[in-house]
Amino acid sequence: MQNKSFFVRDESNHEIIHPTSSAVGPWDPSMMHGRVLCGLVVQGAEEKLASIDEIDLYQAARVTVDMFRFPAMKPLKILTEIVRDGKRIKVIDVHIMSVNDDQIIEIVKGSVVWLLKTEDTKGKVWMPDEWNFTPPSKDLPFFDEATLDNPGHQNPIWETLDPETGKQFQLNNQTEKNGPKTAWIRETHDFIEDEETSSLLRVAQVADYANPLANLSNIGLEYINVDVTLYLQRNPIGEWIGVETLYHGASMGVSVGSMNIYDSNGRIGMSTVAGLAQAKSMK
């Protein structure tokens, strides 16, 4: 992973984190990206669970992220609350607070449902077919600007490969492609400076990709998502995470989009987003 991060901790108060320029979203230069907000929810939930139990005993089966206020590029504080502490089920709510001078405002509410890992059942259950794409090489070097199809722009905050060709691409350049979309995604940034980024945190960020993957039209992305719901049966293995369009539907300016999520060993879950129509599309 390249030596960049989305956030840095405040030197005088480690409970406060500051977004870096890498955390800027595509809709407004003063607005944080939805993917990093998803990451913050998982960051807070993982820290809270680790404080009360052995985190490896549980699987984050569902992550929900509600983004209901403008996420300004301001300092943030993460508040967490254990709402259920059972032996098999633990639920942790996460509140992302924007710290603006003396005013603290909640901009995101998330929840993570943790289920105790046990053994699989013995019966056979029907499952839909999975994609059949070879994952990228573990040794594939990170791209630089010279190899990207967006000359003159900074390196993206994640890398995207076409599973069919193995070549890198930018989804916004795929408006002429009509039909289901697929991609392999690899993170290029650390989440918080000098802190390890967990596999769950990585896939939580990728979950936000359901919006452009499912909702991209022939003229650009015309919906901004207001939430993310991620379901996982296990965490991803390896750096590359695969995504595949599962559903798109829209009516009266409200959209729903979803995608399947894979790693090198197969499907691991799915992500769904609800969106609002934007008067100006993101191209």
Predicted regions: what they are:
Residues 1-283:
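Terminal targeting signals and extreme-terminal segments of soluble enzymes
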